Amino acid sequence: MDINYLLNSGFMVQDEKILLVFDDYEDPAGIVDAAYDKGDFDRLYIFATHAHFDHFSTHVRSYAQKVTRYIFSSDIKHTKRVKVFPTSKITYMKRYSEWEDDAIKVWAYDSTDVGVCFRVELPSGKKVFHAGDFNWWHWEDDTPENIDLAEKAFKRQVKRLKGMEADVAFFPVDGRMGDSQEKGAIDFVARAEVKCLVAMHRVGYPIWTPSRDFLAIRRIPTWSPLKPGEHRTFDGVKFSED
């Protein structure tokens, strides 16, 4: 499985002839453009987990000719930006809904922010999970009441991911939260059966190195991309660079 980092929470995943693009709001390295022009895919699916500007952008409209399906969170349906997209190619998904065609199957899970998380099962049987903005958003300078609400909201939703399988999981490890940046990721890998974790939502912060607390829960390969255009291949056991 080939993985390219776009920016923020944006990634492109290719498995055999299936191309998945997640939360592509900017692509400074031109990764998706290059793949689109090369055309080495049979199916192209573009996902947006929610309507925040750093997850959903109209620039992915330019791929419409070859797109198999745009798969958007249902909150995007109510934005002005989505009106430029061909409605015949859009599927909107609410939390805990499913969608499939003859190539992939998609599950949508709830978030602790707006929108949804996606899990995609590919023809090869491999599974990809993208959390969107689902996380334990613990801000040290917030009020005790809000900190408590954030914890309860996360734990209520993460319980529903217990036993969920994914070969690759994209999950926020947001450097703005300092010592609390791993809280969500630790609880997530403790419950879900994931083979690796890719850190996201950390623009402007250095490479994340898993703490002992994280590794004590699940010793899995991790990747914390730093620069747009970085690439890794995941073989089910480890990441490898070009």
List each language-model region with its residue ranges.
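Active-site-proximal beta-strand elements of phosphoester/diester hydrolases
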Residues: D2-Y5, L20-D23, I104-D110, K127-D133, ...
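Binuclear metal-ion centers of metallo-dependent hydrolases, dominated by the metallo-beta-lactamase
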Residues: N4-S9, R81-D102, Q181-D242
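Pre-active-site segment of Zn-dependent metallo-hydrolases
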Residues: G10-F47, A51, T58-Y63, F134-G163
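Active-site beta-strand termini and strand-to-loop segments that position acidic
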Residues: V13-E16, D101, V120-S124
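Active-site neighborhood of phospho(di)ester-bond hydrolases with catalytic His/Asp-centered motifs
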Residues: V21-Y25, D42-F56, Y70-D75, F129-D133, ...
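Active-site environment of divalent metal-dependent phosphoester hydrolases
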Residues: D27-A29, A51-F56, I76-R81, S97-W99, ...
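Active-site HxH/HxHxD metal-binding segment of metal-dependent hydrolases
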Residues: A34-E98
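Active-site-proximal loop/helix segments of hydrolase catalytic cores
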Residues: T112-A190
